Amino acid sequence: MELSDEAFDRLISKAMDDLPQEYIKGLDNVAIVYADTPDQHQAHKAGLREGNILLGLYEGIPLTQRGAGYTFVLPDKITLFKDSILRVSYDEHSLYEQIKRTLWHEIAHYYGLDHDRIHFLEKRPPTIS
C-alpha cells in the first residue's frame, strides 16, 4: 500500500478530529509529527529489535511525572511511523483505524498510562453514555 505524505497528514488530522476531544484539548506543548521510519535514537529508546516494527513513539515527560518546576521546556513529541503503519494496513479503512489507534496509544502515554493500562482499556468494551 502506498500513500503520499499529504494524504497521510490528512488522515492524522481526521483521526485527531475523531478522537475524544477532551483528550485532544488537554494536550499542551505537544508536537504531533510523522516520519517514514524511526531514527537510530528512537529505535534504541523504544527497545526495537531486529524484525520488530514501531508504529508510534511518545517522547517527553508524562503529565503524571511533572512537578511544579516543569516550565520552559521543549515540546513533547508524538511521532507516527508511516512505513510501519502502512505495513500493517491492508486497505484505506484499516490504515485510518491504525493511525487513530496508534495516535490514541501515544496520547495515552502523554497522560501517564503505561502499556498494561493502555492494553486493558483497548480490550474493554465501549461504554454507552
Regions found by a protein language model. Name each.
Residues 1-98, 110, 114-117, 125-129:
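Active-site rim/adjacent substrate-binding subdomains
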Residues 122:
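Auxiliary alpha/beta "docking" domains used to position bulky ligands
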Residues 98-106:
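Short alpha-helical catalytic segment bearing the HExxH-like zincin motif
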